A protein has these predicted regions:
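Flanking scaffold residues of small Cys/His-coordinated metal-binding clusters
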Residues: 10-11, 26-29
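Short cysteine-rich clusters marking metal-coordination/redox-active sites
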Residues: 16, 31-34
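Short Cys/His-rich metal-coordination motifs, predominantly Zn2+-binding knuckles/fingers
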Residues: 19, 37
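Conserved N-terminal entry element of GNAT/NAT acetyltransferase domains
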Residues: 42-54, 194, 200-202
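Acetyl-CoA-dependent GNAT
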Residues: 46, 50-118, 129-130
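Conserved acetyl-CoA-binding loop-helix of GNAT-fold acetyltransferases
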Residues: 121-134, 161
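Conserved active-site alpha-helix within GNAT-family acetyltransferase domains
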Residues: 126, 150-186
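Conserved GNAT acetyl-CoA-binding A-motif
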Residues: 136-149
Length: 202
C-alpha cells in the first residue's frame, strides 16, 4: 500500500546485518561487499511444499505484513494470492516465506514473493524460487516471469542472480496508477514496473 507518497507496510522488509535492526523500505540502504564478507545467517532446517488449506491464515498474515492485502496488481491485472498456486517454506509449524504464482500468458507469473526478515540470507528465497521453476516445468510452461518495481534493487539483484533477464519495462506505470511517484526502497521514487523472465522448458 502507498499512503502520503510513501510505501506503508505493517512490518519491515529487511534486516540490518550490522545491528540486527528491522528496516522499513525507506530506511534501508545498500552496500557493496566482497563475497567473503557477505552476511549470512545460520542454516535453517526448512522445507518447501505446496500450501495446504491449513496454511490460509499464515498466508494471509505474510501478505498483510508484506503488502497489506492479498490482491496484487502486476502484469496489468489483479491477482488474488489466495486463489493462486502457493508454495511455502516452513520450519516446523512456522511459515518463513511464500511464493504465490499463477498461469498468465502461457507462462508462470510470480504474483507474490516474500520471506520474513529473520529468515533472509539463509537460502529460503532461493529454494522457493527453484520450487516455482519446478512447478512451471511440471506444467510444460515455457517460462517463469516476475515483476519488480524500479526501486526494489535487492529483489532485482536477486532475480538476475537466479537466471532471470529483463524483458520489458513498463515505464511510468506505477506512478501513473497512483498519480505520483511514491517513495520506496532507500528513498527511491517508485515509477516503473520492471518485468523479468527465465526460460524453463525448451
Amino acid at each position: 500500500m502507498i499512503e502520503n507518497g510513501e510505501v506503508e507496510v505493517p512490518y519491515p522488509h529487511y534486516l540490518c546485518p550490522v545491528d540486527g535492526k528491522e528496516l522499513p523500505l525507506a530506511e534501508a540502504r545498500m552496500s557493496v561487499t566482497c563475497a567473503e564478507h557477505q552476511p549470512r545467517g545460520a542454516v535453517l532446517g526448512f522445507t518447501v511444499r505446496e500450501a495446504k488449506a491449513g496454511d490460509r491464515h499464515a498466508i494471509e498474515e505474510i501478505c498483510d505484513r508484506a503488502w497489506g492485502e492479498t490482491e496484487i496488481d502486476v502484469f496489468g491485472r489483479t491477482f488474488d494470492v489466495l486463489a493462486g498456486d502457493n508454495l511455502v517454506a516452513v520450519e516446523g509449524d512456522e511459515l518463513l516465506g511464500l511464493i504465490s504464482c499463477a498461469v498468465h500468458g502461457g507462462e508462470l507469473a510470480v504474483v507474490m514473493y516474500s520471506v520474513y526478515p529473520h529468515a533472509q540470507g539463509r537460502g529460503v528465497g532461493s529454494a522457493l524460487l527453484e520450487a516455482a521453476a519446478g512447478l512451471a516445468a511440471s506444467r510444460s510452461l515455457t517460462a517463469i516471469k516476475a515483476a519488480v518495481s524500479n526501486d526494489d534493487l535487492p529483489l532485482l539483484y536477486f532475480y538476475q542472480r537466479h537466471a532471470f533477464s529483463i524483458g520489458e519495462i513498463a515505464t511510468g506505470l506505477l506512478a501513473d496508477k497512483l498519480g505520483y511517484a511514491g517513495v520506496g526502497f532507500a528513498g527511491i521514487p517508485i515509477r516503473d514496473e520492471i518485468r523479468l523472465r527465465r526460460p524453463v522448458c525448451p
